[in-house]
Amino acid sequence: TGRVWTEDELKKTVEICKKYDKWIICDEIHCDLIRRGVTFTPIMNVAPEYADRIVVCTAPSKTFNLAGMKTSNIVIHNKELQKKWKDYVNGSLSMDGASALGMTAMIAAYTEGEEWLEQLKDYLDGNFAYIDEYLKKYLPKAHLVKAEGTYLAWLDLNGYVDRDEKKLEELMQKKAKVALDEGYIFGEEGRGFERINVASPRSVIEECMNRIRTAFEEEKLV
């Protein structure tokens, strides 16, 4: 959803897991892509005393578009679990580590990519703002769920389709001819929503929004 959990929310989550003796697997893959004015808090900073029951997953793939390098990090403090994980990776998965090229790309991204990343954040913020203004101007019953992190925008179109996901899916794919993530695939609460990747050139975002608007107008929804 693009929500960045606050320190208090993380603390409450850790307390619940402590109470019921549960592990925490925390996917922080989008942690570098945070909106201006929003603070990301690593879960390890909140509960270092619970580190033996926490697994943190990160990767440069989302932020730096390096998914093809197949390089990621899994931080496991618990020595027993660490050994089990290594045995599983080396045995069952037949993987013995990242490739030399992947490691080099990851190091370069994290050590030399700050200026590029700051420019990317500005560009993403601009794309979010463009979609927000477009909806207000042309599709006023829809609204953008403002993401605190990630490059994924949620469009709430229930003002036009009233949670009818099949109608919305047909509008998007057959009328507008755009392939977004249908909200309902993420659960019942996602009905009537579409998820759009805004890490795209502005021209692509403009074309997408224009197609959606045209489809809604042709169906006499606007």
Give names to the regions the model predicted.
Residues 1-222:
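PLP-dependent class I/II
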